C-alpha cells in the first residue's frame, strides 16, 4: 500500500503498487468501520495478497490479507519509505505493469528495514533504477561534448537532455569523472559519491515531479525541527 485516505464515512481510497498490475487505486468499502478487518490490514510496508473487481480506473477491493509481516521501518527508515512510496505515486503511470520495478521497490524497503538510520545507499540505488525504468537515458561514461571517455579527475557539468560536458564551472550541476563512473556502476560506497548522487537524482527527477513539493520530505523536515 502506497497511500490511503478517507472516502465517505466508512470507506477508504487506497493507492496500491502491485507486481502484475502496477500502480492502481481501489475503493475499500467499509474499511473505516470499527469492526472492519481491512482497517488493520491496509497498512504501509505490509506485503499483501489482494483481489479486486472493476474495469474503470477506480477498482473495488474485494479481498486483502497479509502475505508476510510488516517491514519494521522506524525513524529515518520510516520517512524514507514514505518518500519511496510518494515517488512511485507521483511518477509511475496507473495500471502500467512493471514487475522489475516492483522487485526493486521490495529490495529497497528490505534494505531500509535492515539499515534503518543509514538509508542513503538504498535510496540512491532505487532512484537510479526508477530513472532507468522511466527511460531516462544518460551516458555517465562519455563526455557529451567530445564523445571521449570521462576522466576520473576532470569535472563535468550536467546539461538536461544532453548529458555531462567537460567544464571548469563549479556548481550544483558539476560532478567529477570518478563520481560519474561510480554512478554507472551504482557504487555508492563512498560518502562523496553518495552526496553527488543525491544532487544528481534531485535534478534528474525534477521534470517528472514538477514543482509540487514532496509531502514526505516536508513531513521529515517538520519532524526534525519539532525534535530540536
UniProtKB/Swiss-Prot annotation:
Entry-linked NCBIfam families: reco
Cellular component, GO, one term: bacterial nucleoid
Family (UniProt): Belongs to the RecO family.
Described function: Involved in DNA repair and RecF pathway recombination.
Keywords carried by this UniProt record: DNA damage, DNA recombination, DNA repair
Name this polypeptide is given: DNA repair protein RecO
GO terms of biological process kind: DNA recombination; double-strand break repair
InterPro entries on file: ARFGAP/RecO, DNA_rep/recomb_RecO_N, NA-bd_OB-fold, RecO, RecO_C
Family matches, as HAMAP family: RecO
